Amino acid sequence: MKNKIILLWLLLIVILCTISNVKGCGMTTHNTVARRAYNFSSFDGFEQYQKYVSENFDVFDAGAAFPDFGYDCGGLANESEAAHWPPFLRAATKYLLETYPQPWSLDGIRLAVFLLGVTSHQIADISWHSIGGIQQGLIRAMAGQDFNGTYELAHGNADEGGEFELAYNYDLSWLSDKWYVPITDIKNIFHSMNYPRVDDENLLRCNAILYAGAMGVKIGGRFFYPEIAKKSPFLVDHYQDYFIGGLDDMSIWTSYCWPVLMGWMDGEDIGDFCFIQPDPNNDDDNQHLRLHHKHSILKNGSKIKEALSKSILNEMKITNNGKGVTFSLPNSMEKAINQVLNKFNQNPIGTLLEKYLPNLFNNKNKFYQENENEQYNHDEEELNIIDIDIDIEEEEQEEEEDKPIRMLSKNNNFKNYEYLNDKKKSSSSKLKNKSKKNIIKLNSDSNDLGTNFTTIYGQNMYSYFGKDIRSKDLNGDGFDDLIISSPGFGVPGSMQTGCVYYIISNGSSVTIDGGSGFTSEFDIDQVATGKLCGNETHAKFGWNIDVLDFNLDGIFDIIIGAPSSSNANLQYLGMIYIYLGEKNNPAGEWSTESDLPSITIQGIEYADTIGTVLRVADCNADSNADLILGSPHSAGGGTQRGTVQIFYSSKKRISGIPISLNDADYYGHGEVDYEWFGYEIKVAGQGDSSTLLVGSPNYHDEETAIVNIGKITSFPYNVNLNSFDLNPKFVMVGVNKNDKLGYSYNMVNGSLFGLDNVNDIMVLSLPTRGFGDDFDQVGEVVLIDIDNLSGFVEIKNVNLLLSIKGTTKYSRFGESLLIGKLESTDEFARLFVGAPLWTDSIDTGPGCVFTFLPNQHLTNDPAVLKQNIINNTPVVIYDSTHSIKTFRIDDDSGSSGGRSFNNKRKDSRFGFRILLSDFNNDGKNDLIVSADRDSSKILEGGSINIFQ
């Protein structure tokens, strides 16, 4: 029985291995872009195509993957390349109109839907691969950050890694279990383009490989997620939202371009295609148009893999269906998967694969009799299709009962997660033994917070409600108000125009029950006092927000960033919208001057993407908060070095007069390409003793070539300049790969943690820091006294006051940080740490927020503190249990350690943003946690969760 289970796992793994035979963005990346574009589109004027697609998703999904069919199959690389460009769409549209007169038959409709999928694939590859003049597409940026600028390495890892990112962090249940490919029509289109080698047989076989790979990703691709998470933090963090070539951007551009094709298919002149799409018919474009696909994650070429791949393909069910074929997997595959799932409860996958797979693969003769005379070229990653036997059934033949293919394993409770996460059950003690520092285990609390929080949800798909949150007393009544962004808000045809909501607490219908034992739920429209909305598609209005009195009239103003403004002309300049507040209404309530912005600031150069980071702090020692812009993608004298601009608040800020980015009162930029200077910005201290601290998490040392060590640059205030100096006081850099120093940090006066003799403590998170393979990217949060730092310093030489280490791989422990008191009478502040990718199972999890009382692990005794600094022996807090409980935040229970919160909703990114606010006006601060991809009500609609 044990060997049978292993063989079943091998079948699954071999399906996944076929992923490597596919080029371009991975198959399911293309499927996801196409389906997301369908949801983004209004089909205004082309409503029939929306109906066609909705009734033929099996055709649509096959079309979205199709252009990659021949790169490693049948020697059809040139034909596959041809399917990526506008001439193919022109030829296909001409064939459609000549072959299928209106009203279209089912075969005509299927071909039209298939071509919409093909178009999505073509558009997605442009920005993904930086083709046709696009210089900073996703793979280029990934190479610049994670692969020392080596495009080919990034390319392979992005194409395959995106599949595993999707399978792990997203729900693929929508992906069609059956695919239909219009074989005859596609063959005829290629022949009309003078590609005679494309025939029924190789179209059938090559598309079978595409289908097998897609189903492999859907069923079990999540188990390969650690491969890409380890290699590319960039892909994990920015696969969806990277400004040019991320999932959303590729989907928006597909929705921009579909009307051109639909117009052709409705009889409009077949001419130039979409703006983003370069054209081989244009000589200026032609030299840029070869995709040159290569891969690197899964190594092909082994005969055992090839033999087993053939075996899997032989199990596939292929049915003649009109002018095409339908691909499906038999129910026997479902039964095999069920056996594996049942076995999981007894034998975690980590031990099964670790114990048996090496022997199975090393002893190839058990599965494959090697032919000594056979010559095999390991450099050619091509599946030899000649010997694959595929039986094709006729459509009228009785079929098995349709059942959806089961995925591993959104709804299955796997035991012993630590086996996969840490390899060995005793690995927690391994880390303990490695550390020479005092380790304090965290206490767990049995009280269930699930009965004591209120959730407010976003109102439409992909709205990312809760992407940013702020709390400020807008109307001056002494009560905290909430400002919540939803940069993905929009309607089909005009998606991601974005909205920002504000809730004036004394007028809100939201009430949080303190102990009645139920969870309250609201939609944002039920409780919002008002909202401000953008009108530019895909501008991401609300990506970052903040509040200050910009025109010094005594009334707060709302600042809103829209970093993808000017996307429709591929400039991505970005825009800042400033809504001046007023109290001129009869009731004296706070409102904005208008629903339109009072003042705007626009980016100037390509990829400025201003509005990515907004912060407020006093920057000219006049006790008034000023506006700070961080633009990490901006050129800064190179490529994505990043810039920081500061605009002082002033009575000269007048409604109706835009501000030029060149008129900034302060300007700084990064030094190394892709360092992302300005990703985080804080101001420490006050008045003329203040310091500007700018984070560059992707900074790398060009001499050592260690990537993503990160840095924080400190610029002291210069009284003579009435501004921060351009020469740094200190530059602190990381030392290890993926330290990402500068990703997230906060500043606090030492007295809040009981250290009255320390002025400025930096609470610094290193969310991708790892401690060996067993604890890769578990994250760490450290407390540093920065009072005496100067010059160039490596973090390993900095004396730490406290270290808090995460325990869950790739959880992004420290993505968000918050320091504050629950009650004004509390003597010391708490530290809250967000880990939005945290999980407690083999599957993706909900995310989590941890809270600690640092003062209980620090000392106010100057002698002891001095000795700790001399010995470099900070206290280390470490949770070795993997046991996460929720609890009431006001229930101390005498605990000195940490506790945790989560909303128990998978894939929600709970903990992405956190803040404290007395939202229910009871005199105590409430913890407010955003989960910007919460899909429990609507797909990636997002939510905020309010804990009393």
From Swiss-Prot:
Q: Which residues form a coiled coil?
A: none
Q: Name one GO biological process term.
A: cell adhesion
Question: EC annotation?
Answer: 3.1.4.50
Catalytic reaction list: a 6-(alpha-D-glucosaminyl)-1-(1,2-diacyl-sn-glycero-3-phospho)-1D-myo-inositol + H2O = 6-(alpha-D-glucosaminyl)-1D-myo-inositol + a 1,2-diacyl-sn-glycero-3-phosphate + H(+)
Q: Does the keyword Secreted apply?
A: yes
Q: Which InterPro entries match?
A: FG-GAP, Int_alpha_beta-p, Integrin_alpha, Integrin_alpha_N, PLPC/GPLD1
Outline what the protein does: Hydrolyzes the inositol phosphate linkage in proteins anchored by phosphatidylinositol glycans (GPI-anchor) thus releasing these proteins from the membrane. May also cleave GPI anchor intermediates intracellularly.
UniProt similarity note? Belongs to the GPLD1 family.
| Name of this protein | Phosphatidylinositol-glycan-specific phospholipase D
Annotated organism of origin? Dictyostelium discoideum (Social amoeba)
Q: What is the lineage of its organism?
A: Eukaryota, Amoebozoa, Evosea, Eumycetozoa, Dictyostelia
